[in-house]
């Protein structure tokens, strides 16, 4: 199977790396493409973007980096389309992952929130698929 994982901060990188290790125990031939960090890469994921290139905190910093954020969203969508994963696994990182989830769901990709953002309780249309 092919998995695409997105984690946007250090804690997500840790959780993502543990998930990659467990998935690889069950399916040694699986492919994992990811946005995350060094831990996810060391666990066997093919790192596309490092979370250090994605972290913008605060209103002013987000506004200053809006072009970069929009470019990252576009690149992520294109990369998912090119990779055609069996499942898209999102690890927290709500500002980015909720936008990707909405797009992915509309485009027929299976979306799994491994650690879902708290805001999901308010967004019924983005209800996460449970992990079996």
Describe the predicted segments one by one:
Residues 1:
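Nucleotide-sugar donor-binding and catalytic loop/hinge architecture
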Residues 4-132:
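Active-site and donor-binding regions of nucleotide-sugar-utilizing enzymes
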């Amino acid at each position: 199977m092919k998995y695409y994982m997105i984690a946007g901060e250090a804690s997500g990188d840790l959780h993502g790396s543990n998930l990659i290790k467990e998935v690889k125990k069950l399916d040694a031939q699986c492919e994992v493409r990811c946005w995350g960090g060094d831990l996810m890469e060391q666990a066997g994921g093919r790192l596309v973007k490092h979370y250090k290139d994605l972290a913008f905190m605060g209103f002013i910093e987000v506004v200053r980096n809006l072009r970069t954020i929009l470019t990252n969203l576009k690149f992520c969508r294109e990369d998912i389309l090119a990779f055609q994963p069996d499942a898209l696994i999102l690890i927290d990182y709500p500002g980015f992952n909720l936008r990707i989830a909405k797009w992915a769901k509309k485009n027929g990709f299976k979306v799994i929130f491994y650690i879902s953002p708290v805001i999901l309780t308010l967004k019924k249309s983005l209800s996460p698929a449970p992990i079996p």
